[in-house]
């Protein structure tokens, strides 16, 4: 009996094909599976982001303000906020003449606007209206200046001082001023104000207040539009408009005139009003009419002296008494300096 081997069809399938296995590519590691696909996706994402950034930059560049001057159109993205806000480049803010919207204009650095060239003064960089307002703010108000027509004198005049001096020129003729009864000037230098001066001086610690009226100083013009300088501790300042010049001259009429007539025009005199308290035991010493009591002054470059006249008034705590005012009424009482015009 013969045994023939049976051919098996599965033998070939049981054998490992090493050649085919060697020629095949090794499988990618687990962490690298799909790497080509992920790299391409990230690259596309980067390209998308760069395109978006470029679009944003283009939009910003399109929205950047430009100079509104015709023929310029400079982009102001790199300029300061001031120039971007007003849409003008720095060189054109200093030009004397530019064209904006078809009209000649000039940039005002105070208003930050364009104005017509006629609104500027020469080489000024600001318009005339703004310069006027700016200069008005820079001017400081005058200090220690008061009008003689005001009700009271400033309190600063009575701080640590016992003397207030008013100076004017008495050489001018009396008829230089208007002597008619219809004069529009009003007298505010009342006797109550004289009392107020004395009370203020006593509050400041002074036992008496002297108001020295020095005639013959060529400093006053009789025009009401002139200024009256104050001669005293603060001589650097001048008085304001002489609205009440007549008031002082009316008071002068009580001093410069004698009890029976006018003083010689060629003889210069000065007068002193002395206020003394009736409650005090001591009184102010009288000023002699000769010796060193003469008040010096200058007339036409020559040093001269005047003889003072002293009128002493008693100041009571409750009442103020002026017993001799009526007896010294001047003979020219019908004029503007008459006693009857003092209220």
Curated annotation (Swiss-Prot):
Tissue localization of expression: Expressed in stems, leaf sheaths, and young panicles.
Start-end of SBP-type zinc fingers: 64-141
Pfam families xref list: SBP
Family matches, as SUPFAM superfamilies: SBT domain
Compartments where found: Nucleus
Motif Bipartite nuclear localization signal positions after renumbering to this chain: 124-140
Function: Trans-acting factor that binds specifically to the consensus nucleotide sequence 5'-TNCGTACAA-3'. May be involved in panicle development.
UniProt protein name: Squamosa promoter-binding-like protein 11
Species this protein is from: Oryza sativa subsp. japonica
Gene designation per UniProt: SPL11
């Amino acid at each position: 009996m013969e045994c023939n081997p049976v051919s098996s069809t599965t033998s070939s399938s049981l054998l490992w094909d090493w050649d085919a296995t060697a020629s095949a590519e090794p499988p990618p590691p687990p962490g690298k599976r799909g790497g080509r696909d992920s790299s391409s996706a990230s690259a596309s994402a980067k390209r998308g982001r760069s395109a978006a950034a470029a679009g944003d930059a283009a939009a910003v560049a399109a929205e950047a303000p430009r100079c509104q001057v015709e023929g310029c159109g400079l982009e102001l993205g790199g300029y300061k906020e001031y120039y971007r806000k007003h849409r003008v480049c720095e060189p054109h803010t200093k030009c004397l003449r530019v064209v904006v919207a078809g009209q000649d204009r000039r940039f005002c650095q105070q208003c930050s606007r364009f104005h017509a060239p006629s609104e500027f003064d020469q080489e000024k960089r600001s318009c005339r209206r703004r310069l006027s307002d700016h200069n008005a703010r820079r001017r400081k108000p005058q200090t220690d200046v008061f009008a003689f027509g005001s009700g009271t004198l400033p309190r600063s005049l009575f701080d640590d001082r016992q003397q207030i001096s008013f100076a004017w020129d008495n050489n001018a003729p009396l008829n230089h001023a208007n002597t008619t009864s219809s004069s529009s000037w009003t007298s505010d230098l009342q006797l109550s104000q004289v009392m107020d001066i004395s009370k203020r001086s006593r509050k400041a610690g002074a036992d008496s207040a002297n108001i020295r009226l020095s005639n013959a100083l060529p400093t006053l013009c009789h025009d009401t539009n002139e200024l009256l300088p104050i001669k005293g501790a603060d001589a650097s300042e001048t008085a304001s408009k002489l609205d009440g010049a007549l008031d002082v001259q009316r008071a002068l009429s009580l001093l410069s005139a004698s009890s029976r007539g006018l003083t010689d025009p060629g003889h210069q005199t000065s007068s002193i009003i002395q206020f003394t308290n009736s409650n005090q035991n001591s009184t102010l010493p009288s000023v002699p009419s000769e010796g060193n009591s003469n008040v010096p002054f200058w007339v036409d470059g020559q040093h001269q002296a005047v003889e003072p006249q002293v009128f002493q008034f008693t100041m009571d705590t409750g009442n103020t008494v002026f017993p001799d005012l009526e007896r010294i009424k001047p003979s020219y009482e019908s004029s503007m300096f008459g006693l009857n015009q003092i209220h």
